[in-house]
């Protein structure tokens, strides 16, 4: 192969690799509080706004549980603070009595950034799947925009979830004619476990933020 042909192939390969990007951008190990996940050049230039940094006990006061007990189930959950600098979403999810979800939520001010592209969470999970949820209406029982993310058991990870992956739902069912999530109108954020994953669960959360380009 001539040098010029090799260079052309390299350029073509690079262009193709840039054309595909995952919807959930990354899950980087961050095994200590001071580790920072490596990002590509585009991500490093993003503007970041923290929604929650769980550095003190008062940071979890605004969070409240909403479990399947509202529909006759027996699941239970809570959000509590740990002195290590994180909050813990924990409880027991049960499928009995037509149940099947546990969640916590908190009011939040819309981010002062235009063009939000991702929601970012620093978490230590138990290997189960969780949902990050957003609401834009002021009502308690309103459309919820949800996106699912995986966790790695006993390992701190940073997960960036693209805004365009959030799906509109109402009482567990998809809302087909709902508009896309508008990050500028989000006034409530939540965490949920569902999808038949019964049993005890624990999700430690150190930080929740938004990114904008």
Which residues fall in each region the model found?
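Short, low-complexity intrinsically disordered segments enriched in A/P/G/S/L with frequent Arg
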Residues: 4, 16, 38-41
């Amino acid at each position: 192969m001539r040098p010029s042909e090799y260079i052309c192939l390299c350029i073509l390969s690079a262009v193709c690799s840039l054309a595909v990007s995952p919807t959930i951008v990354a899950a980087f190990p961050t095994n200590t509080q001071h580790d920072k996940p490596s990002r590509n050049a585009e991500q490093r230039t993003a503007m970041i706004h923290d929604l929650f940094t769980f550095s003190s006990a008062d940071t979890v006061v605004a969070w409240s549980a909403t479990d399947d007990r509202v529909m006759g189930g027996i699941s239970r959950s809570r959000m509590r603070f740990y002195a290590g600098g994180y909050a813990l979403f924990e409880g027991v999810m049960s499928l009995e009595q037509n149940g099947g979800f546990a969640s916590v939520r908190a009011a939040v001010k819309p981010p002062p950034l235009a063009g939000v592209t991702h929601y970012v969470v620093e978490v230590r999970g138990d290997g189960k799947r969780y949902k990050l949820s957003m609401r834009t209406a002021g009502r308690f029982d309103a459309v919820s925009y949800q996106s699912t993310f995986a966790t790695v058991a006993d390992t701190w990870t940073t997960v960036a979830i693209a805004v365009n992956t959030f799906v509109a739902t109402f009482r567990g069912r998809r809302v087909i004619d709902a508009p896309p999530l508008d990050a500028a109108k989000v006034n409530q954020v939540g965490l949920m476990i569902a999808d038949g994953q019964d049993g005890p669960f624990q999700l430690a959360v150190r930080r929740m933020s938004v990114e904008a380009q």
